[in-house]
Amino acid sequence: MWKRNLLLLILLHIGAFLFPFLTVSKEKLTPERIAVALALLAVVLMSEALSIYLIFKRRGLRLREGLIWILELKEIEYAKLSEEERDLAVKFGYIIIGFPAAGLMLCGAVLEWGDLALAFKFPIIFFAFIVPLLQLCLFPLVVLFYTYNRFLKNDLAASANFSVFWAKLSIAGLVLVLLSLMLVKSEVLPFVKTITAHRTAFILAPLFNIFVGALQYLMAKTGSRELMVTFSIVLFASPLLSFALLLELLGAYSLQESLKFALIGVSVIFLAMFAATWVVLRLFGYSFDTLQRAVEEARVEGPILFWLFWVNAAIVGIGIFFVIRILTF
């Protein structure tokens, strides 16, 4: 099995590194640009190999031994790993995804613009644009996922870990946005005009998500019913600001107009979610009161949780789709 996974990993790298050469127009593929791009790819590959070697060495594993172990790891076995082994697997995943992505972007930027400085600035701009945008698009699903873990599954550890991850991602997004505003002035790079024109929304979006991550973490840790009620009200009101920032960030409306539009959109989505939840509960013979008692007594049936989560997730996803569709129409 590990040989098959290793082959897939090699093919992933080959595909990522060949993609820029196949997509950039032929007139831009000068010998000088190709030479610089190949040198960058060599540096990326050596850095990736060194990173993998070091994470295995810290765990007392040889490179071959570590690769075989991690490439034979199955999804079912992952849940049974110790915290140290899980940390190793996650870091390995970041490395084998991050380095090919970096190689693809750097190589593509060098071939496209022929400027090494711009090539290193492009990933900053790209992720400064994409991280806040994705966070705002996924935010209603994040609230739903957190609610599912915290209140229906009563899994406090998973809720706290997810909150920390969300806050860290938001901090990374904020740093990238600030770096892009300070360092990148060239309008040759894509997304520069969008970020500078809507800098307020790009700064507020990660700050907003840092606050939400901290709020969710406190909800996982607090034992006070009064605080939980207060936090829940704030959390479920937060998609309104999320939608408003998304609309302003995409440049369709001013922030004031976006708030009005978001109020309508969020209200419609929440009403649809409430109605869908009521229908699902009735189909399984529950009401809102009996579901609450069942959760408190830890006797909730698996199928109802499955349908509650995915029906509401579908409603949120469709709602987001229509928002973006309206903006780009």
Swiss-Prot record:
Cell compartment(s), UniProt: Cell membrane
Keywords: Cell membrane, Membrane, Transmembrane, Transmembrane helix
Main subcellular location: membrane
Protein's UniProt keywords contain Transmembrane: yes
Topology of the protein relative to the lipid bilayer: Multi-pass membrane protein
UniProt keyword Cell wall biogenesis/degradation, yes or no: no
Transmembrane segments: 5-24, 34-56, 92-114, 124-146, 159-181, 196-218, 231-253, 263-285, 306-328
GO-annotated cellular components: plasma membrane
Protein name: Uncharacterized protein AF_2131
